[in-house]
Amino acid sequence: MCAAIAAAPPVDEPGRGRDAFEKRCSGCHTLDKIKVGPPLRGVYARKAGTDPQFPYSDAMKSASVSWDDSTLDRWLADTDSVVPGNEMAFRLNDPVERANIIAYLRQLSSASKRTH
């Protein structure tokens, strides 16, 4: 029974994801404006390197990746494993924290689509 619990996928919690975003991501990202990195509101389900506000690297512009749970999880764990040669130097080892951040970004993207 303990092995089954340990093997269960992380539960995503957008509220905790917001807190993790503030702690882990806000040094370089905001939701709506360019900082060091692109704004992240609406990033979920968008093709990588396509926000018209941001001057992406050639690696990001030519990436054939769309941001979903799987690609965002791999990206947050090791950016170079998803888009080699990108300019984001970041790794987040905690799968629960990654799941929470992804849930937050997914929720923001869903809310953004409902208001437009």
How would you label these PLM feature ranges?
Residues D68-H116:
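C-terminal capping alpha-helices of c-type cytochrome domains
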Residues C2-F21, H116:
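Electrostatic cytochrome c docking/interface patches
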Residues M1-A3, G37-P38:
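Short, solvent-exposed linear motifs at loop/edge-of-secondary-structure regions
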Residues F21-L31, I101, L105:
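The canonical Cys-X-X-Cys-His
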Residues P10, G42-R46, T71, W75-T79:
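Membrane-targeting and insertion segments and their boundary/processing signals
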Residues P14-R18, T30, I34-D68, E87, ...:
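Gly/Gly-Pro-rich "capping" loops immediately C-terminal to redox-active cysteine motifs
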